[in-house]
Amino acid sequence: MDLVGQNIANQNTAGYTRQRVETSALGAAGVNSRFSVGARPGEGVSIDGIARLGDAVLDSRVRDALGASGFWTAKAAAAATAEEALAEPSIDGLSNKLSKFWAGWQDLSNSPDSVAAASAALTSAQAITAQIADGYRAVTNQWSDARASVDQKVSSVNAAADQIAALNGAIRDSINSGGTPNELIDRRNLLAQNVARLTGATGKVETDGTLTLRVDGNPLVAGSQAKHLTVTGPQSIEAGAPTTIAWENGTPAVITNGELGGTLAVIAPAADGGVLAGLAKTYNDLAEALADKVNTVHRSGVTADGDPGGDFFAIAPGGPAALNLSVVPTGRDQLALAAPGAGSLDGSIADAIAGIGDLKDGPDALWNGGVASLAVSTAADKSRATAAEAGAVAATSAQLSVAGVDGDEEALNLLTHQTAYNAAARVLTAIDEALDILINRTGLVGR
């Protein structure tokens, strides 16, 4: 009944595994005699131990499923956040801003002398440069947050490894001394699941009751000893170098699973498929393509005063192109809208600039290709994350079907034990009544 109460009290405790008293019947005591002593009843019941009703195979399945789920969930969440920030397709997206920019040049080609059309084109250009810079900053901020989370995750793994090692020692000592370390095992399994979710670690219960956790094939925890992981790599997306994990002795630890593995994949360099670095590169490429294509045509024209056209966009050196893109002209008089010798009312250069938006290798095509690529990869990551999460839920459900506490079952067990106690009490009462008759009433006949 005490154990039933323990199960019921911990019904909602995370990681708790239900327990059961294991009993066996005691045989009749042996009697040394030259004569037959006849049939003898057994000596009752023996409590052999308190069993923890867990399943090591199901526990291992949960750890594996959590590792896969952690990886794809981390990747999908980062990709979805980046995709949402693009706001494509919508009126707030960069594609719409580019369309308005080219339309403004088309208006200028029709009305080269219009101050309003020139002002609209310049305003549209400034809106594009601002949105490119804002988009790039959003990506770099997301990258920095993800990079900081790598440090936090590694610290969490190291702390959990130390706790698991300490619990391993306590569990081993308890088993050797004949104790029941069930609650300690529950705490250890919960920590092991957290480590698996973060790193995709695999585990094996040894013959002495300790749990060995391995990351990248090497032991993170073995017995009462734990190893630590370290993080090296840049703190800025502009560095373009990978963030790596290593053991304390400097040996690389390749983590390709769990939330940590997913986050490392997200912040990887663009050449290695990093979604954030890839998006940052798209912003830089767009800024460079926009400046190159527009400046090439703009320099071929002349202003209303007949002066040669200069650069329309400028990219300041010493930093990312997306952040350093700016608009050079400040008014209509600095816009080169006409071809040389065609007159001040010619708008052929403006028309040529407007046509850049339709080029197959133009800024629009580059941006749309980057957005489409991100959308495809995000959809794939979301799909795999959904499947991995379903696998984790199924594995956890299977584990709980064996290890979880069922309130109805425990209530039935409590009633069973209560009935057994009542029956045992009735046996004692019957024996007491028989002894009373034997002692107090025997030999009274005839008095």
Residue ranges and their predicted role:
Residues 1-447:
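Structural signature of extracellular appendage/secretion-system components
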